[in-house]
Amino acid sequence: MKNSKDILNNAIEEVSEKELMEVAGGKRGSGWIATITDDCPNSVFVCC
C-alpha cells in the first residue's frame, strides 16, 4: 500500500503555460483549474 505522500505526489498535476495563462487572465478560459497545493492540501479547486 502506498503511503500518503506517494498518493499526493501522484495526484499533483503539472500545469502547462497555456493553462496558467488562462487561469491568470492572460487568455479566455474557464477560470478554474483542479489542483492540490502544499499550502492547502484540502483545496481541490482554485479559482483565479
From Swiss-Prot:
Propeptide boundaries: 1-26
One GO biological process term: killing of cells of another organism
Single Gene Ontology MF annotation: signaling receptor binding
Cross-link (Beta-methyllanthionine (Thr-Cys)): T35-C40, T37-C47
Keyword Cell cycle: no
Lanthionine (Ser-Cys), cross-linked positions: S43-C48
Tree of life domain: Bacteria
Post-translational modification: Maturation of lantibiotics involves the enzymatic conversion of Thr, and Ser into dehydrated AA and the formation of thioether bonds with cysteine. This is followed by membrane translocation and cleavage of the modified precursor.
Function: Lanthionine-containing peptide antibiotic (lantibiotic) active on Gram-positive bacteria. The bactericidal activity of lantibiotics is based on depolarization of energized bacterial cytoplasmic membranes, initiated by the formation of aqueous transmembrane pores.
The name this protein goes by in its record: Lantibiotic salivaricin-A
Organism of provenance: Streptococcus salivarius
